[in-house]
Every structure is written in C-alpha cells, then in structure tokens.
Amino acid sequence: MKLLSLLMLAGIAQAIVPPREPRSPTGGGNKLLTYKECVPRATISPRSTSLAWINSEEDGRYISQSDDGALILQNIVTNTNKTLVAADKVPKGYYDYWFKPDLSAVLWATNYTKQYRHSYFANYFILDIKKGSLTPLAQDQAGDIQYAQWSPMNNSIAYVRXNDLYIWNNGKTKRITENGGPDIFNGVPDWVYEEEIFGDRFALWFSPDGEYLAYLRFNETGVPTYTIPYYKNKQKIAPAYPRELEIRYPKVSAKNPTVQFHLLNIASSQETTIPVTAFPENDLVIGEVAWLSSGHDSVAYRAFNRVQDREKIVSVKVESKESKVIRERDGTDGWIDNLLSMSYIGNVNGKEYYVDISDASGWAHIYLYPVDGGKEIALTKGEWEVVAILKVDTKKKLIYFTSTKYHSTTRHVYSVSYDTKVMTPLVNDKEAAYYTASFSAKGGYYILSYQGPNVPYQELYSTKDSKKPLKTITSNDALLEKLKEYKLPKVSFFEIKLPSGETLNVKQRLPPNFNPHKKYPVLFTPYGGPGAQEVSQAWNSLDFKSYITSDPELEYVTWTVDNRGTGYKGRKFRSAVAKRLGFLEAQDQVFAAKEVLKNRWADKDHIGIWGXSYGGFLTAKTLETDSGVFTFGISTAPVSDFRLYDSMYTERYMKTVELNADGYSETAVHKVDGFKNLKGHYLIQHGTGDDNVHFQNAAVLSNTLMNGGVTADKLTTQWFTDSDHGIRYDMDSTYQYKQLSKMVYDQKQRRPESPPMHQWSKRVLAALFGERAEE
C-alpha cells in the first residue's frame, strides 16, 4: 500500500508524506479484499497487547492470563513469573477482574448485563488468594451491582447498588446512602453524564491514601422522560405489548439533572455535602473530580455552566470543608472541552502544583497550576496540540504525553520536564506516524505502540534509553506476511485549501488496480463532529471502505475529509462551527467534492456521501445544500434536528434554544430541494432501540422529506428493530452492510439518463411520483 498515490490534483493538494519503511503494507499479491474479510468488521487486522501494570516495589510487573485461564504475575523485563490465581480458582464466565493493590485478593465481576454505552450490572465476588475462598460482595446480590472499586491503600471496596453507595471492609458492609432510587444516583452517573461528560460508569474517587471518598450525587427529578419501545425484547416470539424503557433524557433547553459534591470519611462513615456555588444549581455541570494531594488534604472539581463555555476549578480543603475557586476561564468564543486531565504532581520550588491541559492560548497545551490558585506555568507551546497526558513521573519530574507537533494527523510521544521545561521525543518525531505508549506503575518502562500508517507493532523500552528496545511485545509479522498475498487499496493523505485560507485533511483510498484513464465513482465518508478526527496516520482498517474500493464490481474511490470544527487543528478551527452545526461542515464537504472532480478519473455522475451518527447528520446537511455535486447519500443513525438530541452535548456547541433559536432552525434538516434534485437515491438507516440518537430523528427526517415532495424513487427509510446506536441487535449489522453494499452497487450501475419508457409506464409513474416521471 503505497502511502503516496497518484494524486493528480494539479497542485491543489499538499501531500503529507510518511516515510517508506520495510514494514509498509505494500501488498504485492493478486488477492483482492472480499466482503467477508471486511464486513461487518475487519478480519485481517493487527493484534495488540494491553497490560495491567501493577504498582509494586519492583517496577515492570503486570498481570497476564495463561492459556488455561490462570492469572500470572509477570515481570516484563526479567521474564520471571508467578501464578497468583490457579485456573481452577477463576470463576467461570467472569466478565472482568481487579486485583487488590497488595495482590492479596481479586474482585471478580460475573453475570454481566449491559446497560448503556459504558455501564452494566453484575455480581461481584472477592477471592482471597491465600485462603482460596470466594465470597460474594453482597450476600443477596442478584446481578444488580452497578460499580465496585478497591481502595488504593486499605481493605475497602466502594460499590453502588440500586443507586446507593456502600463501603465493604474486611467482610463487613456499611450502607452510606439511603436515598438512591430511579431519580437519585449516588456514585454513578445518570444517562446523560455517562454519555456526554464522564464517558464512564462511575462518579466516585478514593483519596490517594484511601481514607476519604469523593462522590457525586445526581438528581433527575423533573428531567423529562423518553420512552423507547422494544418490539422483540430479545424474545423468540414478540410480546403482544412492547417492553418500554423509560430514560430520563434531557433534550435541548429541558431540565438537566442537578449534581451535588460529597465527601465521605471511610473510617467514621461521616458523609458531608459540600456546597457548590461556582454556578447556580440549574446552570451547573461538574465535569471532573481530582485529588490535589498525596494524602487527602485537598480535592478539586471542574465546574462548567450549563452551556459549557465558562469554567471554574474549585478546590475543597477536606478538614475545614472550605471551597475556593483556584482557576476560572471564559470560553464564550466557542466552548470548553472536558479533557479529564487534572493530575497532582506535588511540590515544585516550594509550591504545590497540579498539571492540566488547556486550549486557552488557542492550542491545547500542558500547564502547571498552583493548588491554591495563582499564575500558571506553560510547559508546552506552539501551533500544535497536546492530545493526552500518558504518565506523570514525580520522581524524575517528567510528564509523558502524545502530541500533533509534526502534523495534526500524527501522534508522537514526548516527555517534558516540569523542572527545566525541556521537551524530549521518545520516538522519531520527524516522520508521519501514529504512536502511543503505556507506562509501568513507577514509570521506569513503557510499551511503545506504533499504530500506523504501516503495520503496527509494540516494543518495550526503558525510560533510561528510548533509542533501543528491550524486546518486541507484538510484531504482527504474520499480518505483514498475509498482506503480501493481497493487492490493497492505495492510501494517501493530503491537504486541500479552502478559499478562506484554512486547510482540510483528506484521506484518499484508490482501487488496487487504479487506472487514471478510467472513470471511478467516489464515496465521501465523513464523521465531521466537533473535536473529532477521522483522517489520521493510524492503521488503515481493512473494513467496509476498503472493501468497496477493492471489489472489482464496485471500485469506489473514497475520500474522508475532516471539515472545520474537527479536532487537533487549534481552537479557532474547532470553534468556527459554534452555534451553527452543519453549516460550515457541509460547505467543506461540497468544496472537497468539487476538488475531487478536478481529477479526470472522477465520475461526476456517481459522487456519493455516507456517514453514521454525526456523519449521518452531516450527510443530510450536505445534500440539503443542493450543490448538484453529490448524486446520492446514506445517513446511518443520524441526528436530523438537534432540538431532539441531548442537552449536554448539543448546548456545548449550540447553546440553548432561547439563546440561539434561529441557529437551531437552520441546523435542522428542513430544506428538501437538494434531496428532490438528486440524480440518485437517499437511504436512511436507524435502529428503533437507539437510546442515544433516538429513532425519532429518522422518523422526523423521513416525514420532512416525504411531505416536502421527495418521491419514492429517491428515498428509502430502513429501520432495525430494537437495535441501538451501533445497530448490533439480532445480526442487524449483517443486513445493514448488505444494504449499504447493494446501495453503492446500484448507484454505480445507475445511468445518467433514464431509458425510454412506454407511455403506460410514464402515466403510472406520473401518478405515483408526480411530474418528475415526465421529465
């Protein structure tokens, strides 16, 4: 797979050139990727190893599982190992496990039942490794525990059941809260906080010394309820009356859940409500909680106003219960992302600091902030962005992180000293590549993961020497050999420049047997949401996009374009879409389509666009422009009107309806001419059990188009019974991708001009579809 292909863009594009390396998947064989190899998920894909590092006196230790299921304590450097849990002590059918910090016990989750994107219910058991005894966390548990977590320093477990918080300690359980129920959540988030704020299933945090627990309480009283019917409900025979799931789901401008901040003394079970005054109760979102001490002296929370364009970091002194705003920011030029990146680092030149990422300068960078408030210290700077903090080594005074310093599509690993501010690459940062790393508990070792664009691999390094690996962890040599049997799509990365001066990143896939003298259909595949990124130097998944590029009967060229509003190109580029989602993004997709048509090989009669979720919304908004460039489109699980989506996501970018009524009206898909004038077809796909983007969006969109005069030969709506946002219920994804494949095949076969019809056929079509049949 040459990573620079025949662009033939006549100077309109600037290539992003990765180096040629021996591990580049150049193919060289004659096999073409098949449908079954790519759909519904890629079967030819790289392997990777994820280690559960253990914090112990000896660095570089981790837990692995042997072939027979036993849990092994291994030292990655010395290759020594010790069996901690024999195979016959491992519960059958377990879902996950967590070791007690001193390795004397294991907490097991069994009887897994999925709830939302991250949350689930389960039974939990504690295995005493020395005694070999297995004890239920709760004697009467019935697969109903929502979350459980070991304390970092003692024998305690905090867990949540029926939305109430409990503390287990050496076999004894203390119920901490008594008010948990359908509308009150203690220590776990409700739906909207799980989905849009934390991206996780817990809302409790032990202090580093294990003596205190900070947790949040959410109150959904008054939050409107959305009802989702489940027609089959996983039954062989559908119930006469569908099961109805009622979710407190705050839509735009509706009442949000309120949130309270609490502290619990583990030893005394004394619980304290800390007043939150950063913003009024109905204008408050708590986005992050972090302990700002090595013991339990200070804890902080990140507070946003409702529309998340103002931020306050509030420190709470645990003993006095006093609160203080130690940092605040006005981000009304756009929005403020919740990066969940606060981390205590301790004393620096006589003052206590924590580290955080902020894009207040216009670019996301690492700063040191005084725990008690005061002027920040910038550790990184420049017109590039820090993506994530990987590890803080307080002994060496180093922060390890990934960034886009080379290019917005790349990731390289660096360290920066918060003593000297010297920044050091741990990889070759002069190549177009995509790296991340996983550091051992004490930071002495790390697994470097090269993730693309060539065949991924993983190597072990010592932080004392980033030049020479200690060993290879995952080679993917078998994948490299297998790829030699194939002719693969030709992938290239480049930029196109907008008339306004911004550049857009593009990922292009050309058919394996590409001939510049032939005509090819083109499919655009955007996501395009705020802060997202699709165009990156990460491994090119051999998925549906690669399939439609490879199949000789399809041979689509695909373009993935990251429009304005997407991530890692600075705050100005991101914030351009604020208060008008779908407007600039659609303009950029249209501009890119006009650019692709400057290539002689691009077939102007067969230019499609397909996206899922926000990409489905963007597909509809792009067709709505009536540009005449796109000839067909597919929206999978789309938002069609952001007034129908949840408040905490939408208002971050659009504000409330009261503040931006005209913006919401324009953002909704409401103009039908672009759909009526399509040369080809428009397909909508949606799961009826989608708890994220409700099926209501597809129903409203379909109705808007039908009532607006879009004829039946132009529009198909496909629902998937009981499927969620990922369309996975009852093999629905299999049907979904077959339908997608048929759609792109039919559109390629569609002729620009309809064949002559008998007068009788014309009369029938005129009666069915209106005047268009007479054209």
UniProtKB/Swiss-Prot annotation:
Glycosylation, residue list: 81, 111, 154, 219
GO cellular component annotations of the record: extracellular region; plasma membrane
Biophysicochemical property: pH dependence: Optimum pH is 7.0-9.0.
Active-site feature positions: 613 (charge relay system), 690 (charge relay system), 725 (charge relay system)
Reactions catalysed according to its record: Release of an N-terminal dipeptide, Xaa-Yaa-|-Zaa-, from a polypeptide, preferentially when Yaa is Pro, provided Zaa is neither Pro nor hydroxyproline
Keywords: Aminopeptidase, Glycoprotein, Hydrolase, Protease, Secreted, Serine protease, Signal, Virulence
Segment forming the signal sequence: 1-15
EC number: 3.4.14.5
Source superkingdom: Eukaryota
Keyword Glycoprotein in record: yes
One GO MF term attached to the UniProt entry: aminopeptidase activity
PROSITE patterns the record matches: CARBOXYPEPT_SER_SER, PRO_ENDOPEP_SER
Gene Ontology annotations of biological process type: proteolysis
Compartment annotation: Secreted
InterPro entries assigned to the protein according to its UniProt record, in alphabetical order: AB_hydrolase_fold, Pept_S9_AS, Peptidase_S9_cat, Peptidase_S9B_N, Serine_Prot_S9B/DPPIV
Pfam families xrefs: DPPIV_N, Peptidase_S9
Job of this protein: Extracellular dipeptidyl-peptidase which removes N-terminal dipeptides sequentially from polypeptides having unsubstituted N-termini provided that the penultimate residue is proline. Contributes to pathogenicity.
PANTHER family, sorted: DIPEPTIDYL PEPTIDASE 4-RELATED (PTHR11731:SF162), PROTEASE FAMILY S9B,C DIPEPTIDYL-PEPTIDASE IV-RELATED (PTHR11731)
UniProt family annotation: Belongs to the peptidase S9B family.
Name this protein carries in UniProt: Dipeptidyl peptidase 4
